[in-house]
Amino acid sequence: MDKIIKSIAQSGAFRAYVLDSTETVALAQEKHNTLSSSTVALGRTLIANQILAANQKGDSKITVKVIGDSSFGHIISVADTKGHVKGYIQNTGVDIKKTATGEVLVGPFMGNGHFVTIIDYGTGNPYASTTPLITGEIGEDFAYYLTESEQTPSAIGLNVLLDENDKVKVAGGFMVQVLPGASEEEIARYEKRLQEMPAISHLLASKNHVDALLEAIYGDEPYKRLSEEPLSFQCDCSRERFEAALMTLPKADLQAMIDEDKGAEIVCQFCGTKYQFNESDLEALINDKA
């Protein structure tokens, strides 16, 4: 089961989140049938949103959009504070690797664009923020957003490793944040440790990558685990929701679906579930609008 572990240095100077998001990203790949680069780009976006959602309280919903002028198109993710996330990538078929090593490439092909976040607190006044893509690798772009928009200097690492068949092998990441009151000495010590950390891909390849991440972040520094919470890919689409969307269409449009297509098929962008509405269903909607 996927999870996020929240922890804090005993000194109170820093906190860290570490995530195992393997099942989340594997299910996203399965639902969208993504190729290698698209899988990694979508997976990193989902993990970033899982981190962002874990930072919120109440029943907030968080939307993350990675919008670039690239082969990937837009990447959209929506998460809640209960550990659920969903998402999709416009172009599922991007498959770009280094010839020599087989490394999956994302950043060099993301192009120019923006990292957009929308936090809906349920009050009718969502908070939106837009920051430019810095590298297109998504992790660095997320860290830049946290520093610029939330004024919280953060170290971010997130990645998706694929097997020889380009299926998700492991996915996860971490966030480390300085807390108010940290001394210059403590900040310098943690900056040095983060600079010396192995690459996120190396840590994820460890047998128990969650413990490996915590060990790399804290070293010999004493820390406390605050909580361990489940994570999952979960879409909240339903037939009723799409039926309500059809009800917003003019009668003439519904009648055209009956006359021309003998019904309608609606596919959820976030999970690929197909909903069929036959002629009788559409006629009932027309009658309900009368």
From Swiss-Prot:
PTM annotation: Under oxidizing conditions two disulfide bonds are formed involving the reactive cysteines. Under reducing conditions zinc is bound to the reactive cysteines and the protein is inactive.
Pfam families per record: HSP33
Keywords for the protein's UniProt record, in alphabetical order: Chaperone, Cytoplasm, Disulfide bond, Redox-active center, Zinc
Gene3D superfamilies: Hsp33 domain, HSP33 redox switch-like
Cystine residue pairs: 235-237, 268-271
Single Gene Ontology MF annotation: unfolded protein binding
Chief location: cytoplasm
A cellular component annotation (GO) from this entry: cytoplasm
Subcellular location field: Cytoplasm
GO biological process, one term: protein refolding
Task performed by this protein: Redox regulated molecular chaperone. Protects both thermally unfolding and oxidatively damaged proteins from irreversible aggregation. Plays an important role in the bacterial defense system toward oxidative stress.
PANTHER family recorded: 33 KDA CHAPERONIN
The family this protein is said to belong to: Belongs to the HSP33 family.
Protein name listed in UniProt: 33 kDa chaperonin
